[in-house]
Amino acid sequence: MPSLRDLRRRIKSIKSTQQITKAMKAVSAAKMRKAQEAVLSARPYSKRLKSVLGRVAVASGGVSHPLLAVREPKKVAYIVITADRGLCGGFNSNVIRRATQEMREQSAELSLITVGRKSRDFFRRRGYNIAQQYVGLGEEIKYGTAKEIASFVIEKYSAGEYDVVYLVYSQFVNILVQKPVVVKLLPAEPPEEEGEARKVEYIFEPSAAAVLTELLPKYIENAIYQGLLESKAGEHSARMTAMDNATKNASDMIDRLTLSMNRARQAQITKEISEIVGGAAALE
């Protein structure tokens, strides 16, 4: 059985750790609220952009465009978005696991564009071909980052170096749930208009084909930007939940160790009393 000194030392150490997890939970909660507001406010724009792209694609009458070109998937690229840091439960490992599962099913030549240190370090250690990496993006997601990533993959796709490009990230569902998803970025697949929306005729200037040419790169940029926002909100939510669980587990450990310490102290006192009584009896 541990001594009283050891038990006190362990309790003190756990209390110190608990203070850290409490502070990290509070910080993550504040960052999560900000990231959640950003992702929720961006979703309507993303949805409307897809809708507009679908209308323009229909109006353009099947015009050919490099970003719409479908080729045999001999070279496939994956953009994998994770966090730079850990201490967020299974957030990073779930995204990486989903990406590796998808890649195992591919017989094509693979290339990776990693966003976040966790994905970069994981795939680098395992010898994957990392064509581009982005780390240290900070807490505030900038549209320029998404534009830079989009420009890289669009250039590679247009040059025929990639035949298909996928985006893998963790979709923010709610504070407790983050769902890893895989989205095909290229070739771009404009959604089809349904119902009454198909019957509406639009006038495009200078032409639907010209609008489509301008819209497609922005569609790719926005999809990546939305993925970055979703991932950031999910990261902070997962970290807040992980730190909350760690704080609760620390409280449980402190309670158990305190009980053990009280029992040890009681046993020590009982032993001392027995020794005193025994000594007194010996003197009689």
Swiss-Prot record:
- What gene makes this protein? atpG
- What is the protein name given in its UniProt record? ATP synthase gamma chain
**Biological processes annotated in GO:** proton motive force-driven plasma membrane ATP synthesis
Q: How does it sit in the membrane?
A: Peripheral membrane protein
Chain's role: Produces ATP from ADP in the presence of a proton gradient across the membrane. The gamma chain is believed to be important in regulating ATPase activity and the flow of protons through the CF(0) complex.
Task: Quote the PANTHER family the UniProt record gives.
Answer: ATP SYNTHASE GAMMA CHAIN, ATP SYNTHASE SUBUNIT GAMMA, MITOCHONDRIAL
Q: Which UniProt keywords apply?
A: ATP synthesis, Cell membrane, CF(1), Hydrogen ion transport, Ion transport, Membrane, Transport
**Which source organism?**
Pelotomaculum thermopropionicum (strain DSM 13744 / JCM 10971 / SI)
Q: Where in the cell is it found?
A: Cell membrane
Q: Which GO terms describe its cellular component?
A: plasma membrane; proton-transporting ATP synthase complex
> Subunit comment for this entry?
F-type ATPases have 2 components, CF(1) - the catalytic core - and CF(0) - the membrane proton channel. CF(1) has five subunits: alpha(3), beta(3), gamma(1), delta(1), epsilon(1). CF(0) has three main subunits: a, b and c.
**SUPFAM superfamilies noted in UniProt:** ATP synthase (F1-ATPase), gamma subunit (SSF52943)
Give the protein family.
Belongs to the ATPase gamma chain family.
